[in-house]
Amino acid sequence: MSLQISILTPEKPFWNGQAEEIILPTETGEMGVLKNHAPIITGLDVGAMLVRTKEEWNSYALMGGFAVVKKNKVTILANEAESAETIDAEEAKNAFEIAKGNLEKAEGVKQKVEANFAYKRAKARFQVVKVVNKYS
């Protein structure tokens, strides 16, 4: 038996399916989940999530949230989620470069916090595109 994965966003159920493995961007680093994983609830950071089905790896950009792992079911409650296939590679690369520059130029606490969030978001989108498209 494999893992049953459900990814939910405020707008709609984003993805449901079976997977052999999932790698989550938690607030303390990446966390891999295989079948028979110990039960856990964890916060998700903005970052790339990888899902391995029997056929392939799929990548998604998550914009924070929570994950619940219990009895071979993984439920992800994400603020936002995007599939790599729906992200334009050039736009993601340009947005990443702009966000990186804005973070380096940010002054003051508010501007640094906003620039850091924009950077993490752009980095997540660019990372998932690179995984799928081998873009660099």
Swiss-Prot record:
GO MF annotation terms: ATP binding; proton-transporting ATP synthase activity, rotational mechanism
Matches recorded under InterPro entries: ATP_synth_F1_dsu/esu, ATP_synth_F1_dsu/esu_N, ATP_synth_F1_esu_C, ATPsynth_dsu/esu_N
Membrane-related topology note: Peripheral membrane protein
Record-linked Pfam families: ATP-synt_DE (PF00401), ATP-synt_DE_N (PF02823)
Gene Ontology cellular-component annotations: chloroplast thylakoid membrane; proton-transporting ATP synthase complex
Cell membrane in keyword set: no
Organism domain of life: Eukaryota
UniProt entry keywords in alphabetical sequence: ATP synthesis, CF(1), Chloroplast, Hydrogen ion transport, Ion transport, Membrane, Plastid, Thylakoid, Transport
Chief subcellular location: plastid
Localization terms from the record: Plastid, Chloroplast thylakoid membrane
Presence of keyword Thylakoid: yes
Family: Belongs to the ATPase epsilon chain family.
Subunit (UniProt): F-type ATPases have 2 components, CF(1) - the catalytic core - and CF(0) - the membrane proton channel. CF(1) has five subunits: alpha(3), beta(3), gamma(1), delta(1), epsilon(1). CF(0) has three main subunits: a, b and c.
Function: Produces ATP from ADP in the presence of a proton gradient across the membrane.
Record NCBIfam families: ATP_synt_epsi (TIGR01216)
Alphabetized PANTHER family for the sequence: ATP SYNTHASE DELTA/EPSILON CHAIN (PTHR13822), ATP SYNTHASE EPSILON CHAIN, CHLOROPLASTIC (PTHR13822:SF10)
Entry protein name: ATP synthase epsilon chain, chloroplastic
Organism from which the protein derives: Tetradesmus obliquus (Green alga)
Lineage: Eukaryota, Viridiplantae, Chlorophyta, core chlorophytes, Chlorophyceae
